[in-house]
Amino acid sequence: MNFRLLAALTSLSWACAAAPAPTTETAPLPPPSSAAQHLYAAAKNDILQVRSLLRSGRTQSSVGSGFLIGASNLVVTNYHVVSQFALDPDTYVGEWVDTSGQRGNVELLAVDVLHDLAVLCVNRSGTGFFKMPEPLARLAQGQYLYSLGNPLDLGFAISEGAYNGVIARSFYDQLMFTGPINAGMSGGPSVTVDGAVAGVNVSKRLDGELVSFLVPARFAQALLKQVATQTRPPADFTAVVTAQLLQHQRAMVDQLLATPLALKPMAPYRVPVRESEQMRCWGRSNVKADKPFAVDDANCSMESAIFVSGALQTGQISIRHQLLRATGLDQLRFAQLASASFRNENFGSNKDSRLTGPSCTEQFVRSQDVPLRAVLCVRAYRKFAGLYDFALLTASTDQPLISLQSRLDARGVSYENGLRLTRAFLAAFALEPKGGRP
């Protein structure tokens, strides 16, 4: 970043309306360590709570955190913190509250839905504590970071933890933070002991202890550069989010189809899967002596999705294969079992406010030497034009006592890319070579 642009980022001010309110009380919190205490004392004036309120009655709907950049009136936070008033500004409005209890309205300037970031404008300026200089701080695995925010709406707090590298399983880089990030801290900063911004608090795993994630500071820096060059905020953030989701699905599908799908044996078939850093596969066999059939499962899915709203996460692909084998059923009863399993699949309904009802077509096709019954269902996003959910369900028809049932789900893709995925998936099925694997 040149010095002129850096000055623009730290001094840029936007005109936005705000209204003061009385000081609010916060719950007492245990004292932090001396290093954390020093950081909090230096940074507390630049930490904000970001609230989403109903316009009617101004009752609180959701809360998160944010932080002022330099001496400007620009605030960095998470997209998911502001998503309600970004997508539905007629119903929701944003508000900031600082550590002294002062508050005011916010204006949304920019969003990055792919990295879960947003930039706001408020009617107060920072003290200059949080900066986004170039180059950014270099992190070493194991070094301590300090996360700031307002956990569970209990009061502003600071927590300590260790930086443990970049997570590759997410489609976009995230930093692993081995420390507590609780609800309400999303959008707050995580800093080094010197106060340099390392990342933005974003999420945590619910199935582990102290496994939390940060958005790398470089993505916030890029969004601030974008704000510095724009003359006014976008008039319609739904259109902005749509364009970013279309960008994501192009990259996602191109990466998935860059090489042929891998084939895994599920005798007597070979089934298409994709295993990568972003997409993991798991298998399971369910054979019980008291059951007249056996089931083998293989599931592959992306481990992350794009948060759009509290009711919608998208930009994700999953593959499932299920092999049913008769161990004590005749052909008629096994056919009934396999048909019931096929009919049990759910493709959604037309009562969904997010997507249209499924439009489905059914055909009998042949993939190499494997005859298949195939059902393709497509649903359009009501609010995000050009995006669709594709669901392809197949069942083998060549074995009287074996049924391979497979499903491909592609969420948040263009119509063209949905067809690309389904064609590649259908074309990949094959029979195991005679005499075993090659």
Please describe what each predicted stretch is.
Residues 21-67, 232-287:
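N-terminal activation segment of mature serine protease catalytic domains
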Residues 248-362:
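Non-catalytic interaction/regulatory modules that flank or connect domains
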Residues 43-59, 123-131, 154-231:
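Active-site region of chymotrypsin-like
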Residues 66-68, 106-108, 163, 280:
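Conserved hydrophobic positions within beta-strands
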Residues 221, 231, 277-279, 400-438:
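Surface-exposed amphipathic alpha-helical segments
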Residues 336-395:
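Signature of long, low-cysteine stretches enriched in small and polar/charged residues
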